Amino acid sequence: MNDLMRDLAPISAKAWAEIETEARGTLTVTLAARKVVDFKGPLGWDASSVSLGRTEALAEEPKAAGSAAVVTVRKRAVQPLIELCVPFTLKRAELEAIARGASDADLDPVIEAARAIAIAEDRAVFHGFAAGGITGIGEASAEHALDLPADLADFPGVLVRALAVLRDRGVDGPYALVLGRTVYQQLMETTTPGGYPVLQHVRRLFEGPLIWAPGVDGAMLISQRGGDFELTVGRDFSIGYHDHDAQSVHLYLQESMTFRCLGPEAAVPLRGLSQAATKA
């Protein structure tokens, strides 16, 4: 038994498999950052930080008794991992139904928890999480951000400018276009005055993937050349057991992670109108 304590849960192997399948499917669809940044891990639950390769000189120095020698001290810089955890509750009646062969058990709480933790990870990567010591891509690359047009029929022109920004900085492709929920939906619905789908025009401008990212505000054009953005995971998404009563089983979905922007020049944030107003 490990710290997840799954062996203590009154859940059959078949029900556990169904729970894992639902969680995995939702995570696969919802997660966007892992499709465009470098992934390091999983390093394990005991991984606590990432070495930054730098040190800080300390003003206070330990004294060597009986010696005139000077002892210098430097503290190594690290970036700590943060823990993300989403609790959820399943009805025992539904879990028992799975064991009896039901294929329509209510596992919506699993889906909701997986969606929540996936969006939390993506927001930390794309928009940062100051309390956790994480600078997001949008923050690190804000100097060269572009504003999305009020009419997304003009989106291809903005994309051309964003591609030019990356190439002018010597950033090679392939490139990926990460689209927030609203931008993605509007691009799907927008056509040019001649009736041509804007999304098809966008796809002709570059060969990279268009990625739906519900955790992103606006959009981002990101190089996938590698080495610029690093997501480090200690424990990858895991489901653990908390407790249970006669009616319910209380579980949680957990991971530990951090993120570093090593080459902020490799992304161009495309801000929505509300974001542009905030930055002005």
Swiss-Prot record:
Its main location: other. Pfam families: Linocin_M18 (PF04454). Keywords: Encapsulin nanocompartment, Ion transport, Iron, Iron storage, Iron transport, Transport. The keyword Transport applies. InterPro entries: ENCAP (IPR007544), Encapsulin_nc (IPR051429). It is found in: Encapsulin nanocompartment. One of its GO terms (biological process) is iron ion transport. Gene3D superfamilies: 3.30.2400.30, hypothetical protein PF0899 domain. GO terms for cellular component: encapsulin nanocompartment. It comes from the Bacteria. Shell component of a type 1 encapsulin nanocompartment. Assembles into proteinaceous icosahedral shells 24 nm in diameter in the presence and absence of its ferritin cargo protein. The center of cargo-loaded nanocompartments is loaded with iron. The empty encapsulin nanocompartment sequesters about 2200 Fe ions while the cargo-loaded nanocompartment can maximally sequester about 4150 Fe ions. Does not have any detectable ferroxidase activity. PANTHER family: PEPTIDASE U56 FAMILY (PTHR37165), TYPE 1 ENCAPSULIN SHELL PROTEIN (PTHR37165:SF1). This encapsulin nanocompartment is formed by 60 subunits; monomers form pentamers which assemble to form shells. There are 12 pores where the pentamers meet as well as 3-fold axis channels and dimer channels; none are larger than 3-4 Angstroms in diameter. The N-terminus of the protein is inside the shell, the C-terminus is outside. Belongs to the encapsulin family. Family 1 subfamily. This is Type 1 encapsulin shell protein. The lineage of its organism: Bacteria, Pseudomonadati, Pseudomonadota, Alphaproteobacteria, Rhodospirillales.
